[in-house]
Amino acid sequence: MYGLINVGFGNVIIGDRVIAIVNPESAPLKRLKEVAKEEGKLIDATYGRKTRAIVITDSNHVILSAIQPETIASRFMQTFTDIEKLLEEIRQAERRTEE
């Protein structure tokens, strides 16, 4: 229901597949990044810049982004808000056609 979320440099992810958006500085997340790389599930969307966020998906893919986690999260919530507004407009249009 979230649609596509921009993670920087024109790269987008499917919002419904996201489990977490986290800061990459902790040791466990650095290990997670290495494991994902070994398993072929690491996607680097940083374009050579510093990794500022790690996005974890329900398929165990780990996506690196140069965008701050807070920024990605706000885009995530904005997408959700936009979808809710669109659904409400559709519901109102359906009510008008029923009358």
From Swiss-Prot:
Pfam families: RemA-like. Coiled coil: none annotated. InterPro entries: RemA-like (IPR007169). Belongs to the RemA family. This is Putative regulatory protein Kole_1849. HAMAP family: RemA.
